[in-house]
Amino acid sequence: MKYRIEGHCHTKDSSPCGQVYAEDILKAYQENNYSGIIITDHFSYQVFGNNDSWKNIVDKFLLGYKNAKKLESKYNIKIYLGMEIRFTDSYNDYLVYGITEEFLYQNEWLYMKSLKELKTLSKDKYLIIQAHPFRYGNTLADLNLLDGIEINNTNPHNICNNHLAYNAYLKSNLIPTCGCDFHSIDCISKTEYMEFFNLPKDNSELVAMIKQRKYIIKTK
């Protein structure tokens, strides 16, 4: 058996640009035969600012993930915690897989730091993947600070120049990932996704399987 996993998903619960609440997201992915979703809501100064306590900011960020997580058994879809972080020095976005709630609470003002600092903090326990590196306004980051590149962002509402991301991946030793950059129901891809040979039981296993390349990227 093989398992479809969404690698890039935003909820209306936590991301202002999201158009669909967590439960409706799970319903839609169940209808499209997915087995897992990595919730990667936006985590940035633009979204959360610095006028609230860090605890309240993290609470708000985690809302979409937690609302989805408690519905896992109802929809038979595994939910994994991730994020799409943007620092204040550029418009680049980075998907981070494997993070824990504790990590977020302990590292105050994480999005006010830098990619280099995040790499140090991750201690190779998490995966840092540059999302849509060739979308307008984005530039390819220092490859030494990345674990992977999103080589196929299938969002129908943005031009991501995936061919350039794929070429950059081919010239590197980085991990390739794929995701629909979900914001609305029409984003879900029926033909392009990450397909795992086994369903990761938790975030740690998800990271391990991706590092070991125990998945393939399905394309049209």
Briefly describe each language-model feature range:
Residues 83-84, 126-134:
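Aromatic-lined carbohydrate-recognition surfaces of secreted/lumenal glycan-active proteins
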Residues 61, 108-117, 159-167:
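Active-site-adjacent beta->alpha loops and helix N-cap segments on the catalytic face
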Residues 92-125:
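Binuclear metal-dependent hydrolase catalytic cores centered on His/Asp/Glu-rich metal-binding motifs
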Residues 1-7, 11, 15, 21-27, ...:
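Charged catalytic cores and adjacent phosphate/nucleic-acid-binding surfaces used
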